[in-house]
Amino acid sequence: MEAVPILRVGDVLMVSIQVDLHDQLAERLAGDVADAVAKHDPKGVLIDISGVEVVDTFIGRVLGHIAQLARLMGSRVVLV
């Protein structure tokens, strides 16, 4: 089962997506990031999608949703 690691580095969560992000994995990632933000209360969340070859409209919406959730929970979000 594929998973996207969420690493805590100081006051920042780093999410580095290095696998093909299919719909089910993207939805699971949204929940995992929300849980990690609630648990660690980071100042920022860095989402690295440089390893993703194709970002379709669904994946784009899920990434936007993840960013919106993190911002609502008080974290700044950077997508690279």
Pin down the residues of each PLM region.
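STAS-typified acidic loop motif
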Residues: 2-31
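Conserved alpha-helical scaffold flanking the Walker A/P-loop in AAA+ ATPase domains
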Residues: 34-37
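Amphipathic alpha-helical interaction surfaces in cytosolic regulatory modules
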Residues: 39-43, 47-80
